[in-house]
């Protein structure tokens, strides 16, 4: 795709070697490499990749007939005219199969290719995180030559033997519900910028509970462990597997707890008791400063549970300002948490009171009780 993510979750170049945006982050310009080729499963070069391929791919995603609505939500919300074009193709029915990227451009969708190696997207609103959006598969390129060769139905149903590649590997073999094997793409544009496996096989494990057995027998080199496997290993300091545990690559999502300020009962009437209680600041702070989520975090990251801690609506790394400052670090300053470094032991919000919320609890019961709340 245009961009990718490094092992720390930060956006890095891929087919786009550089990119920039205007002052209000509504116009994003991507400068593409000029050494990217499409090749088939045998490594034979089939076509040269240019900005046109991204237009073709984007039209495919937004075309209701061709793409059948897969992965349309993100571009529909972040690119001018994208949602309208999707609706247009939906109204066209089967006739949308003949529509091309030129129809998309004529319809006013906010994407253009000024030359073979420049791509410009226009957002309906400021979108400072658009580079992370552009790394998503909704923005992948597609070869017009391959679509013409296979036809719309054939392209939609293509497999590893008929698809074209531009990434670091070619798929050598795919056995349904068993394995898929990869070999280096001899035409990979960044071959001299990375290290690749000579041969790599991904084994599909239907039951993760047997994953550890496969690892111990040497059938696989790495696996995701079940929670019970992890508990068994980490609870025994002499277990040899402790030396080989490692954290997984961070992912771009977050979970939050949302409190309902207008709860209704089973009859549809406002639950005044709860609504008055939750409106009380001390009541809410009991949740914020009292809940110890370390054990819950450990279900995702047993090695460093507090690496999962997030005091913000968005996850770290989603967007940066024009000075290169990461968004959540700016929010941390506003919350007074910017001096609270990761310590691996205590949640940031619990450090000031060591989890003791007895005074807060007293306040959270006295104040609502004074206005008729019962506990």
Question: What function would you assign to each model-found segment?
Answer:
Residues 1-23, 164-165:
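N-terminal lobe/hinge region of extracytoplasmic solute-binding protein
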Residues 7, 33-64, 168-300, 318-375:
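Extracytoplasmic/periplasmic ligand-capture domains
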Residues 19, 108-110:
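Beta-strand-rich interaction surfaces with strong enrichment in secreted/lumenal proteins
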Residues 22-25, 113-118:
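A short, structured loop/turn motif at beta-sheet edges
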Residues 37-39, 127-130, 307:
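Primarily extracytoplasmic ectodomains and periplasmic/lumenal surface modules that are beta-strand-rich
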Residues 70-74, 300-314:
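Short, glycine/acidic-rich hinge or "gate" loops at secondary-structure transitions
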Residues 93-98, 105-108, 115-117, 122-201:
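Gly/Pro-rich hinge or "lid" segments in bacterial periplasmic/extracellular proteins
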């Amino acid at each position: 795709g245009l961009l990718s993510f490094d092992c720390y979750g930060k956006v890095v170049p891929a087919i786009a070697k550089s990119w920039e945006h205007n002052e209000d982050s509504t116009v994003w310009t991507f400068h593409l490499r000029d050494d990217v080729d499409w090749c088939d499963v045998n490594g034979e070069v089939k076509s040269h990749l240019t900005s046109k391929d991204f237009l073709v791919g984007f039209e495919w995603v937004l075309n209701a007939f061709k793409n059948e609505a897969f992965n349309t939500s993100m571009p529909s919300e972040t690119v001018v005219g994208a949602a309208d074009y999707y609706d247009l193709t939906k109204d066209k029915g089967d006739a949308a199969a003949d529509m091309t990227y030129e129809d998309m451009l004529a319809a006013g969708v906010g994407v253009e290719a000024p030359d073979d190696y420049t791509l410009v997207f226009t957002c309906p609103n400021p979108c400072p995180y658009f580079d992370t959006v552009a790394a998503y598969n909704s923005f992948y390129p597609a070869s017009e030559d391959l679509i013409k060769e296979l036809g719309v139905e054939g392209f939609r149903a293509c497999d590893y033997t008929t698809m074209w590649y531009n990434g670091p590997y070619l798929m050598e073999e795919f056995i349904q519900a068993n394995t898929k094997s990869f070999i280096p793409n001899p035409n990979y544009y960044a071959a001299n910028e990375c290290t690749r496996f000579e041969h790599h096989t991904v084994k599909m494990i239907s039951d993760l509970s047997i994953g550890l057995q496969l690892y111990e027998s040497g059938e696989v080199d790495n696996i995701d462990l079940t929670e019970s496997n992890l508990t068994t290993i980490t609870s025994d300091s002499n277990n040899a597997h402790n030396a080989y545990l490692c954290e997984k690559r961070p992912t771009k999502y977050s979970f939050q707890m949302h409190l309902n300020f207008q709860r209704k009962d089973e009859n549809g009437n406002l639950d005044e008791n709860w609504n008055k209680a939750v409106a009380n600041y001390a009541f809410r702070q009991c949740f914020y400063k009292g809940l110890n989520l370390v054990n819950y975090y450990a279900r995702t990251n047993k090695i460093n549970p507090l690496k999962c801690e997030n005091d913000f609506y968005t996850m770290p790394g989603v967007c940066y300002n024009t000075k290169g400052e990461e968004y959540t670090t700016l929010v941390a300053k506003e919350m007074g948490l910017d001096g609270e470094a990761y310590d691996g032991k205590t949640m940031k919000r619990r450090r000031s009171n060591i989890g003791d919320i007895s005074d807060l609890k007293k306040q959270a019961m006295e104040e609502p009780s004074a206005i008729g709340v019962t506990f």
